[in-house]
């Protein structure tokens, strides 16, 4: 694997990965932001060029200084040759197995291959599979048409649905970094200093969205990550069941479409209310699903998990 640095090569790779949506969404979304300023300081590895078979995005080495920060230490993968993936992942030049880290992807059939490498490294692997949701507009990015983004914008705008919540005097707007603690305190996978730092970084660099109450406080929100995935969606308990999330997401999707930003999300298997909500917004579940592996070296296995 070697680094792909030239902007025009990254643009070619990005266009090529669009043809493999939804399986390529994690790396596709990462590269989308890399070629637009790279605020998270990520880098792209391929096994060959231009006929690549494997793509990995990861933080630059100087970003991965905290061995116990899996929010930062995250790798996104896409492979056309799953059988060759173990050989790639076992290389210390590709993956730092001495850290706690995440691997994320949107392809079936990689669990056994990743776990086989993990066994050889004597690390603990925690695997999660969830439903991957995209809109019809994202699926149309698979087109090789040069006006791909314009088509995405037109289709997405047509598919936007209107919702009105049951609460008056609310205002849809972008999240501010001052809202980070509120988001962190209500994120199932957050509630710690490392996640707070990560959330602040996301809100500072990518458009998050919320509904404000009459006093200007967020009551429903969502955050965009470096892969263009929308995560951390939440509505305060006293406002749940009143259409808040629907209205916020409708405004958020409209904003992203106006900015020509692709987006997707995932939902946990048992969260039936969220499944219904995203379907009403025009999202469709993808057969490939959303996958995450958390790797923990032996020296950290007795410590509290995040």
Where are these regions (language model features)?
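Short amphipathic alpha-helix that is part of the acyltransferase structural core
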Residues: 1-27, 140-194, 304-306
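A conserved beta-strand-loop-helix scaffold within acyl/acetyltransferase catalytic domains
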Residues: 178, 191-238
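Conserved hydrophobic beta-strand within the GNAT/NAT acetyltransferase core sheet
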Residues: 230, 263-267
């Amino acid at each position: 694997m070697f680094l792909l640095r030239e902007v025009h090569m990254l643009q070619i790779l990005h266009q090529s990965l669009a043809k493999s949506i939804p399986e390529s969404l994690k790396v596709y979304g990462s590269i989308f932001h890399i070629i637009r300023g790279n605020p998270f300081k990520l880098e792209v590895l391929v096994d060959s060029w231009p006929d690549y078979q494997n793509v990995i995005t990861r933080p630059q080495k100087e970003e991965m200084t905290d061995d116990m920060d899996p929010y930062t230490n995250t790798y996104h993968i896409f492979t056309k040759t799953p059988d060759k993936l173990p050989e790639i992942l076992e290389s210390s030049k590709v993956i730092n197995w001495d850290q706690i880290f995440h691997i994320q992807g949107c392809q079936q059939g990689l669990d056994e291959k990743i776990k086989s490498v993990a066994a050889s490294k004597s690390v603990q692997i925690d695997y999660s599979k969830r439903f991957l949701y995209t809109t019809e507009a994202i699926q149309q990015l698979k087109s090789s048409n040069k006006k791909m983004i314009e088509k995405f914008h037109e289709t997405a705008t047509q598919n936007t649905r209107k919702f009105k919540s049951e609460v008056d005097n609310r205002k849809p707007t972008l999240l501010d970094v001052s809202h980070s603690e509120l988001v962190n305190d209500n994120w199932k996978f957050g509630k710690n200093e490392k996640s707070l730092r990560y959330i602040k970084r996301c809100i500072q660099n990518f458009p998050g969205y919320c509904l404000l109450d009459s006093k200007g406080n967020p009551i429903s929100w969502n955050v965009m990550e470096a892969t263009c995935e929308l995560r951390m969606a939440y509505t305060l308990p006293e406002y749940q069941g009143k259409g808040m999330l629907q209205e916020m997401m409708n405004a958020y999707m409209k904003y992203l479409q106006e900015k020509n930003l692709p987006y997707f999300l995932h939902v946990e298997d048992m969260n039936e209310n969220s499944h219904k909500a995203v379907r009403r917004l025009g999202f469709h579940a993808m057969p490939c699903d959303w996958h995450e592996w958390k790797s923990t070296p032996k020296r950290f296995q007795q410590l509290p998990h995040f």
